[in-house]
């Protein structure tokens, strides 16, 4: 089966692909990328300062090769829907994903490693792996980098979830209303854990 990268598709053609073939979408390979993780930091001053740690390069091969992964993306750490619903819900239902044949669940956002780590600690996230895409390079390659000027966010990720098998995207749930002008109410309809779990369990 042929595969192709999303970066080679225009926004219109990517949307048409998902609309026309839906659940039978042809897999496409994610772009090779190196993420900048931060490990080993200790908390100081109530968790606002991190010291003693080091930078660690983590590649897409490390994260996705020979694994079945659910990854969800969101506009930003510490924001209302992301903090109150999406991230904690995925963490709470982590075992259900494992039972459905998933190896790992990842949360990715256009935030740096310090922010992602602090957010996970603040919400007491125990299971979901936090992936920092500080420069938005990976998010851009997924066709999901958008501008959110009304909130003063700058470039962030549009909200989505995806099922990735051995580095190939095999299912993609994108929230409606994709735009670059903040002309939306930050929809959260299809990138929730229940939608992905329903899809996974129907395939078992």
Spell out what each predicted region is.
Residues 2-204:
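Chalcogenol-based redox active-site neighborhoods
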């Amino acid at each position: 089966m042929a595969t192709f990268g999303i970066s080679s598709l225009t926004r219109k053609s990517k949307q048409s692909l998902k609309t026309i073939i839906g659940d039978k979408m042809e897999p496409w390979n994610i772009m090779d990328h190196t993420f900048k993780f931060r490990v080993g930091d200790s908390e100081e001053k109530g968790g606002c300062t991190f010291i003693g740690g080091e930078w660690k390069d983590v590649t897409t091969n490390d994260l996705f090769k020979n694994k079945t992964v659910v990854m969800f993306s969101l506009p930003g750490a510490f924001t209302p829907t992301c903090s109150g619903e999406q991230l904690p819900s995925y963490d709470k239902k982590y075992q259900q994903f494992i039972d459905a044949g998933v190896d790992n669940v990842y949360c990715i956002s256009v935030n740096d490693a310090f922010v992602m780590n602090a957010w996970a600690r603040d919400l007491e996230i125990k299971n979901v792996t936090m992936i920092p895409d500080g420069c938005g390079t990976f998010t851009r390659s997924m066709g999901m980098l958008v501008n959110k000027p009304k909130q003063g966010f700058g470039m962030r990720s549009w909200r989505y979830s995806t099922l990735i098998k051995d580095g190939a995207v095999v299912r993609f749930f994108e929230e409606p209303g994709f735009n670059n002008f903040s002309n939306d109410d930050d929809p959260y309809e299809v990138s929730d854990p229940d939608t992905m779990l329903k899809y996974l369990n129907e395939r078992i």
